[in-house]
Amino acid sequence: VFTEVMVSTDDQEIAEIAQRYGTKVPFMRSPEMSSDMAMTAPVLIEVMNKYKELGKVFEQLCCIYPTAPFISAQRLNQAMTLLISEKVDGVLPIVQYSYPPQRCLLMRENRAKMLYPENYNVRSQDLEPIYHDCGQFYCLRTDSLFAEQKLFCQNTLPIVIPESEAQDIDNEEDWKMAEIKFRMLRGEQTR
């Protein structure tokens, strides 16, 4: 589904590992795009500009996050197919919140307060489902990325995935949850 797979990094060790497994690292990421505060859209714009300098132009791109262990080839193929066939700016996987955010609470002066008190007497199952980006991948038209300078473009199509396929890994607890989901997806007993 992809004509080229590359890793964007500023770390030589990561670059060497990526290349050992057959991934291209045609250039290193700039220091400006390597800080903990760097956002993904500017990194992708830098990557596309560097490719253009090398004489390569891509009409579409797909950014895959390394912290998302349950991405499948089928989902990536589905997303790229939708991106092209539906003529949208982007496609991203989303997952329904496990509990309705309309019933969320804020802490004010050491007290719990409903953010949306009008939903106090509404059953959670009667509230409209709300979804969030599950942080796995973004498939985009390159011209839309450049025009809008963001990952979530105006005309973005979602792919709703089950909670069992969504797990971002940012800390040790996330890792443990990923292990549980992995065993569950493989049909193994969880401990």
What are these regions (language model features)?
Residues 159-160, 164-191:
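Hydrophobic helical membrane-anchoring modules
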Residues 2-6, 89, 164-165:
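Short active-site oxyanion
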Residues 1, 21-23, 108:
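Short, structured coil segments at secondary-structure junctions
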